[in-house]
A protein has these predicted regions:
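Active-site-adjacent structural elements in enzyme catalytic cores
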Residues: 1-262
């Protein structure tokens, strides 16, 4: 039976974060608010827990989740190469709705899915999420919805879709502030490349990086295979038909074409 904590109450918030932290350390799943939509998360370093997260959403290994962190230091430990502009982008837009796809540190013992050696990293601008992340460390987080269903902007919507059997703790942070997904930028190229347009505009990115390759659309838009990743990551909440993935997008955490908006 899931436990739900109203984080508007200070005592409940403290108890909820402690309970959620214990659940994450056990390899259980929790639901938490972010600055985009609600997320379903677990220990990024537990392959069993990540597999359970994907199964609960109805998603395969070809759609690995991005990783949320509570500090730049935590992100630096996950990333082998930030490229020429990664640090500047972090300093300008974190915490906030910008996911950076980078080459992952090869020595890490984890299995997020078919990542092709990359990791999508983001530091959300949400106090409840940050408190939990600082307590437990990096979490694999996907949008708190079943594949093919709308993303949740209220905890009640997440409960309705995910139920109380697979989720140990729900942290209720109220309605999320934005329905717009995070912008995803691939830093594994010499020139930063936008994989998905979102809350951070390409003009804002270019003000920091200079040259940025915009999101490419090849041919007519096709229905997504499952949902509409960080719905964690392929279009806005108001966009029911996210773009089909390009070959270079496949496997990068947070770029799955299924509606994840985290």
């Amino acid at each position: 039976m899931s436990r739900i904590y109203d984080c508007a109450d200070e005592t409940a918030r403290k108890d909820g974060i402690a309970d959620a932290a214990s659940a994450v350390r056990r390899g259980d799943l929790v639901v938490l608010p972010t600055d985009t939509v609600y997320g379903i998360g677990t220990d990024a370093f537990s392959p069993t827990a990540v597999a359970r997260l994907l199964a609960t959403k109805g998603r395969g290994r070809e759609m690995p989740p991005p990783v949320l962190v509570g500090s730049m230091r935590a992100a630096n430990a996950l990333v082998d190469d930030l490229g020429n502009h990664g640090r500047d982008l972090m300093e300008e837009f974190w915490p906030g709705p910008l996911t950076l796809v980078c080459t992952a540190t090869p020595s890490l013992s984890w299995d997020l899915g078919d990542t092709k050696g990359t990791v999508g990293v983001r530091m959300p601008m949400d106090p409840v999420a940050l408190d939990l992340l600082k307590e437990v460390g990096p979490m694999a987080v996907s949008s708190a919805n079943k594949s093919g269903q709308p993303s949740a902007t209220r905890v009640e919507e997440a409960v309705e879709q995910l139920g109380d059997e697979d989720i140990a703790v729900y942290l209720d942070g109220g309605e999320t502030e934005s329905r717009v997904s995070s912008t995803i930028v691939d830093l594994t190229y010499a020139v930063p490349r936008v994989l998905r347009a979102g809350a951070v505009s390409i003009e804002q990115l270019r003000a920091v990086c200079g040259t940025v390759i915009g999101e490419l659309r090849r041919g007519p838009r096709k229905p997504a295979r499952s949902e509409g990743a960080e719905a964690e990551d392929a279009g806005e909440a108001t966009d029911p038909e996210p773009r089909a993935p390009r070959e270079e997008d496949r496997g990068a955490p947070g770029t799955a074409p299924d509606g994840d908006k985290n």
